[in-house]
Amino acid sequence: MLTNGRLWVSVGVTSEQGPRADNQDFAAAYLGSETQRARQGLVAALADGVSGAKGGRMAAELAVSSLIDGYYAQGDTIGPAAAVERVMRAYNRWLAAMGRSEAMAHACSTFTAIVVRGRRAHVLHVGDSRAWLLRDGHLTQITADHTRSHPDQRHILLRALGLEEQLRLDHHEIALAEHDRLLLTSDGVHGPLSARRLGRLLGRRQSAEADAAALVEAALAAGGQDNATALVLDIVSLPSASHDAIAGDMARLPILPPPQVGDSVDGF
């Protein structure tokens, strides 16, 4: 398969209920068509519905599906981070309002997303799910948990989807290299497993699908008491640097207001 000059990835996702009564995690990736990948990139996201709240699974699944649907509806002239923030702020307002209803009382969810566009990855994050980068055998945690610092209160989220009407997403931008591995985990995976263990398992470099399954299996075998979800993205090939520069220039173009009656446009 020829992939030179194109964005190409391999993806693997595994999610297990574990000992919980139901699975409130949800993760998915949308690779799109070759044209979509060239213009807007690809999207992957993981969300973990807050346990004990009604509608936790629904909040998580709708967060991911809303991102995927809404991101590609934004068009390719807006930057990836701005597009994700626009979509998720609208979703957060809806979820916060629904959280006041009986059907979805206090529904909240963590949310961690990766947009790979050109030769760069954009990570948007709120909550305590995590994004990681494996490069040259070294695993780096990209995101920071939005939880209380006291060891006995680290399960308490300070920021999440639906928790407040105003959403604040952390944004990290990373220059990618071919053969990088990006990883998303719920706390049911990185809770029982140390970063060193995660790095060893991910560094075996089997298929993305096999390694996602191995991470979840190891977390549950280590005594994990939560839902466990892992999403692995292997960067197989990247477009040329010139493509990245053009995409960046387009994203920085100002969005002008629509013309009004009587305005002159290009001399007409």
Q: Where do the PLM segments sit?
A:
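PP2C/PPM-type serine/threonine phosphatase catalytic domain
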Residues: 1-268
